[in-house]
UniProtKB/Swiss-Prot annotation:
Belongs to the universal ribosomal protein uL22 family. It comes from the Bacteria. It comes from Corynebacterium glutamicum (strain ATCC 13032 / DSM 20300 / JCM 1318 / BCRC 11384 / CCUG 27702 / LMG 3730 / NBRC 12168 / NCIMB 10025 / NRRL B-2784 / 534). This protein binds specifically to 23S rRNA; its binding is stimulated by other ribosomal proteins, e.g. L4, L17, and L20. It is important during the early stages of 50S assembly. It makes multiple contacts with different domains of the 23S rRNA in the assembled 50S subunit and ribosome. This is Large ribosomal subunit protein uL22. The lineage of its organism: Bacteria, Bacillati, Actinomycetota, Actinomycetes, Mycobacteriales.
Length: 120
C-alpha cells in the first residue's frame, strides 16, 4: 500500500434542487477534465448547473490544497446526486381541498482523480 493519494472529493448537502434534475447536469460532466467540466457548466441552461459547478470547483481545490495535485490533470471520476430530505408543503385548491407539494433536495458528490498528462 502506497501513501500516494490521487483523488479528492467534495460534497454539497441539502441543495435545493431535485436529484433527477441534478443528475441530468451531472451526466454532462462525468468523465471530463475539471477545466472542461467547468466550462460546460458555465454555459449550461439548467439551474442545477450552478451548484454542480461549485462542487466540481471545490473538489479541484481540495485536491490542490490538501493533496498537492495539479488541477490541470484532474478528471471527474465519480459524480452522483443522492436524494436529501423532502419538505412537504400544501397548495390550496378549490372547494377547500389541498394538494401536497414535495420540495426535494439533493446531496451532490464529486470525486476527482489525477490522470497522467498523456492518458486520455
Amino acid at each position: 500500500m502506497s501513501d500516494n493519494i490521487t483523488s479528492a472529493s467534495a460534497t454539497a448537502r441539502f441543495v435545493r434542487v431535485s436529484p433527477m434534475k441534478a443528475r441530468r447536469v451531472i451526466d454532462l460532466v462525468r468523465g471530463k477534465t475539471v477545466v472542461e467540466a467547468l466550462s460546460i457548466l458555465k454555459y449550461a441552461p439548467q439551474a442545477a448547473s450552478e451548484p454542480v459547478a461549485k462542487v466540481v470547483a471545490s473538489a479541484a481545490a481540495n485536491a490542490e490544497n490538501n493533496f498537492g495535485l495539479d488541477p490541470r490533470t484532474l478528471v471527474i471520476s465519480e459524480a452522483y446526486a443522492n436524494e436529501g430530505p423532502t419538505m412537504k408543503r400544501f397548495q390550496p385548491r378549490a372547494q377547500g381541498r389541498a394538494f401536497q407539494i414535495r420540495k426535494r433536495s439533493s446531496h451532490i458528490t464529486v470525486v476527482v482523480e489525477s490522470q497522467k498528462e498523456g492518458a486520455n
